[in-house]
Amino acid sequence: MDYGLKNLGNTCYMNSIIQCIRYTGLLSLDDDDFIQNCIKTEKRNEFGLMREWLRLQKSFIIENDTKCVNPIDFYKSFAQNISRSEYTFVGFEQNDAGEFITILFDLLHKCLKYKIKLSVQGDIKNNLDRIAVDSIDYWKKFFENEYSYLIQSTYSQLLSITSCPKCDYSTRNHDPIQIITLHMKPQFETIYDMLSHYTSVETLDSDNSWKCDKCKENVNPEKKIVFWNLSDILIIQIKRYDSNLKKIDRHIGFPILLNMNKFCMNYAEQSMTYKLCSISVQSGSLNGGHYYAICNTDIDNKWKVFNDSNVFDIDFSDMMQQKPYCLFYKRI
């Protein structure tokens, strides 16, 4: 059912993100991996948050004459969990949608987390194999004691390579990433331009200079970031505010089918093609803006606007002219 969500007073940013998540299929009642994780950890109830999330998901599939779901119980549980956590959140005041994604996923992850054993199979035959072993070691460090369906589905792995410009010495580091944050520049026209810049070689300044362990020279090292592995769900956030908090309100081209081959090492040889499921759009300014979602519905393959309780069709051409703040892609 393509139901809207009631605005409870400046909750448009939360409503927008929940609709975007919903149309990826993530954390849904139809997702067997999610349900199995819920069963495995059902005794862990973070102040009712997972229970209220499941009830909210059920509300989306029950016949409702108003065509609108009231998320009050879930938002109350979310606020209670925030009050017991280390997060600073302003309740039902205007907040950042990207911040809401991070906190929501972390709180739900705490409901789902469990221990997992990670091990390396096979022999190391080349440098890529060595990097793969290192990546698993880093993954164990971050997640072996707190793994979950959400880690599996939404966390990618970055590989940063810092190298000496005077010899072939380099160091590597792996980091998990859940939201890919891309910065706008005047010359960028598409998301591909932004991703190319994100993964380009950067010469570090004198504040970050170091003495090379191999040639012993003091150098300004070169740093390059690539994706080592990519998650099934990709969340891309476009930073639309400059250092003075002025909104950069211009269109950036975004594809329906996103090809990440150019930006990922893809050691696991997975598909690097992603389909756009939903976008979150912010109109207005940072402090006085309004969020709404545009999602690709499963049944009729139409694009629809979810503006709080209002739901209506949007032409494909109009959707492609939107200026999204967050984009949700799913591996195909």
Regions found by a protein language model. Give the residues of each.
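Exposed substrate/partner-binding surface patches
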Residues: 1, 21-25, 30-44, 136, ...
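USP/UBP deubiquitinase core
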Residues: 1-128, 184, 233-238, 316-324, ...
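Beta-sheet entry/capping signal
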Residues: 11, 161-163, 233, 292
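Conserved S/T- and glycine-rich ATP-binding loop of Class I adenylate-forming
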Residues: 104, 164, 212
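Intrinsically disordered, low-complexity regulatory segments in eukaryotic proteins
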Residues: 124-142
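Folded extracytoplasmic luminal domains of secretory or organellar precursors
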Residues: 156-158, 165
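Residues immediately within or flanking Cys/His clusters that coordinate Zn2+
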Residues: 159-161, 209
